[in-house]
């Protein structure tokens, strides 16, 4: 998915980013321009050699929002000699990763988190970096879902379908690590709210 691709590219060294929204009719011409501007057609070997030489490398991730009928383009650039040239040329406003955060459709944001030592000791891990990147729901989206569940608990005797719809919403939310953790918090909050309201198990 686009979220997984962005997370992978950032975790592998992208330091700057830019985002733009493009209508379907313009996507082909815009991608063509970006490909020429950032040399997006380089092979993996060519990108590797550029990085070894201290030259920045750019990746482009494209996400199509079916609801809004618009393409979200994420330009991800590594640190390097040519980064300054691109920035000075004023092509696109390249921001440092996390300043601001990369946000997808106002619902999800890419954040840096600290891993627990137990997770770092997992032999299945490919690296032991104490910090890692993951996606989570934005505070605004999280609060919207939380408020929905609070109301679903209150109206349950009259309309039990609201709680079922809430569970369906959670099942459709992107299942990446940081988001799964938030879902756990949301459900724990809902269970606690249910017990407080009805004095029984959900």
Residue ranges and their predicted role:
Residues 1-202:
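Non-catalytic terminal/accessory segments
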